[in-house]
Amino acid sequence: MSYPRAAITLSLVMAACSSETASTGTGPEPYDGPPIPWDYAPFPAVVEPADNPTTADKIALGTLLFYDPILSRDQKTACATCHSEVWGMSDGLAVSIGVDGEGPTGPGREGPNLTTRNAPTIWNVAFKDELFWDGRSASLEAQALEPLKTETELDLDPESAVNALAAVPEYVDLFDAAFPGEGITTENIARALSAMERSVLSVRAPYDRYTEGDVGAISETAKEGMQLFADGGCDGCHTPPLFESARYVARLPVGQDVGREEVTTDASDHGAFRVPTLRNVRESGPYFHDGSAPDLETAVRTEADVSAARGEGRALTDEEVARVVVFLNKALTDRTKEPPRPHSVPSGLQIPEDGFRVPR
């Protein structure tokens, strides 16, 4: 099986090691850019464990694993089924459909194995030290194996995954290159996938260029939406520059999903979920942990109404909602470092295909 390994590797090295990425997290500098309605902060440092330093070989391997259905019981489902670049590194569904699903990735997919939550985007997970809506994983390496073992997702035990990969000579070579002297292990599967996920960065959105002095990077309408976003206190949870935070908040009516409480057993966490990033949010709907908001307008209006009901803000008019949405759509969209979809994978299996394309 042939695939553009060199092209993939080159693209990923640029994504992981460019000066743009390396310049983040180096400490605060005096802000002298155009007006912004909050205190300026630089990007934080990438969270990278000492035992898994990022390399181009790991990222290249992780990308192939991410798109290869070899890591699923049905040999048709991949990580990219629920985290596709077409759908903002999510899947366009309210809740995901894992193994035994039929149809394209995204709307139109059907199947018996529904997850209980909306697929969170993997944009900028490199900056997180807790993963999933409930924060149950303390590292990307721990997170990477959970879908593998979950019956409604990939449903493949780690030992079977190792054996399947070991039967493909190209994967043997790729693991030897990425992990010399170690080979194919469960831990190295997780490390390769984590390295790939750390390369999926949004750090060059129009908002970023605006703060660097390009006043024309965002429109006047987007600037008005940015001010409304700040006036409503939205930045208190969706804090720039990542437009997210490590907070867990209960904003929606609590159903059967108790959220963070299941992890901490603390009643104060009842119905609380981690604040998601708003970068590339244009493409990652439906929204909220349960996918109950079909579009951004609904999500923004719902959040504003909740804030108003709690005395933390006010409801927004339709025109104001539209301006906030323009800010989110136009100022925070940045796909320059999304993973390159390979043309084929070493297993020879069919990469999950998207039957629908969202507007670019």
What are the roles of these predicted feature ranges?
Residues 5, 18-360:
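Periplasmic c-type cytochrome electron-transfer domains
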Residues 8-12:
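Hydrophobic helical h-region of N-terminal Sec-dependent signal peptides
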